[in-house]
Regions:
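Membrane-water interface at transmembrane helix exits
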Residues: 27, 31-35, 80-83, 109, ...
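Mid-bilayer segments of alpha-helical transmembrane spans in multi-pass integral membrane proteins
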Residues: 95-107, 120, 124, 128-137, ...
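Interfacial loop-to-transmembrane junctions
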Residues: 112-125, 279-286
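Extracellular/periplasmic helix-loop-helix junctions in multi-pass membrane proteins
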Residues: 269-283
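Membrane-helix cytosolic exit motif
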Residues: 287-305
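Hydrophobic alpha-helical transmembrane segments
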Residues: 32-42, 61-75, 118-129, 166, ...
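Alpha-helical membrane segments and immediately flanking helix-loop junctions
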Residues: 57-112, 211-271
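Selected transmembrane alpha-helices and immediately adjacent juxtamembrane segments
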Residues: 1-50, 124-133, 137-204, 208-209, ...
Length: 317
């Protein structure tokens, strides 16, 4: 059983690495090469005033755009190609952890019945507010970030051959780092699924869902999103909402929580290659998700209570 789970997890891990690698490799290479052409400097100059609000240089717009339109790995691939400070990388990591892969993950939310404006407002709002706060509150992190396996930059390449070679090196090391994280993660997740430990975890989560203002039947949806993520866990989550009879209110609250904090293992570990502290990143996501969900649930409950009172009041008068 264990061997079968490991084998299946390895296959899924390799397939995932290949799928994501097809994005991160060309993106890393292309973005690196574009730095030595007039294209990237022109884009940077155009939007750098806006990025300054978030405490970022103009170059940082590239990973933000790629991360939100494609996926987190594309955003990280772009970061690996740019010289940024530790503070800038951390701000980007927080922004991308809240808002990434918008097309696919928003599509999942829509299938479950959550309104489009809710998802976009929460994700883009959290990314923007968190970046502004970190920029204002954190005065350190001014040193240049060192990216995991990627060696410190010694000199700027002066020929196109050297530029392409260094770009290929950055892209290849990025894929290696990706494989070292994704493959073991998929093996572990497969073992957890096959041994039904995710089901056990779902039962443990019941008190948590109540504390967040949701019914117990939302727990499997939360577990799938927290462990596998919105994109990979889409099938499980959509099925869980249908089979467990989750109401639209609870589904919306669950997704408000999950857009702030989902795939907690994978979406945290993949930032390791960027050389930033990942524990604060996880705590920011988790605390924000809990606080936001409780606030929205409380406001929603009060609105429902007031709505129930109105007909009675109107009838008695």
């Amino acid at each position: 059983m264990l061997l079968s789970s490991c084998k299946k997890g390895l296959q899924v891990g390799l397939k995932t690495t290949w799928t994501l690698g097809k994005v991160i490799f060309p993106v890393t290479l292309l973005v690196y090469i574009l730095q030595f052409t007039p294209v990237l400097p022109w884009v940077i100059d155009l939007i750098s005033p806006i990025m300054g609000v978030f405490g970022l240089s103009g170059e940082a717009a590239i990973p933000l755009v790629l991360g939100n339109t494609l996926n987190l790995y594309a955003g990280i691939g772009a970061i690996l190609s740019i010289d940024l400070t530790v503070k800038e990388v951390f701000i980007l990591a927080v922004m991308l952890s809240f808002s990434h892969n918008l097309f696919i993950e928003t599509g999942v939310a829509l299938k479950v019945g959550v309104k489009l404006w809710v998802i976009l407002l929460v994700r883009l709002g959290l990314a923007s507010v968190s970046a502004i706060l970190i920029n204002l509150l954190w005065k350190g992190g001014g040193s240049i970030a060192q990216y995991g396996l990627l060696p410190a930059k010694e000199s700027t390449p002066d020929t196109w051959g050297a530029i392409v070679f260094e770009g290929l090196q950055k892209a290849s090391l990025g894929i290696l780092q990706l494989a070292l994280i994704v493959i073991p993660l998929m093996v572990i997740m497969q073992i957890l699924k096959d041994k039904k430990w995710l089901d056990v975890f779902s039962r443990w989560m019941a008190p948590v869902t109540r504390g967040l203002g949701m019914k117990e039947n939302t727990s499997m949806t939360l577990v799938a999103g927290l462990t596998i993520g919105l994109a990979y866990g889409a099938g499980i989550m959509i099925q869980a909402v249908k089979e467990d009879g989750v109401s639209r209110k609870d589904a919306t609250l669950a997704f408000i929580f999950l857009v702030a904090c989902h795939a907690v293992v994978e979406d945290t570990l993949i930032f390791v290659p960027l050389g930033i502290p990942i524990l604060p990143l996880l705590l920011i996501r988790l605390c924000t998700a809990v606080a936001l969900t409780i606030v929205v649930a409380t406001i929603w409950k009060r609105a429902e209570w007031n709505k129930r009172k109105e007909p009675t009041y109107g009838h008695s008068s």
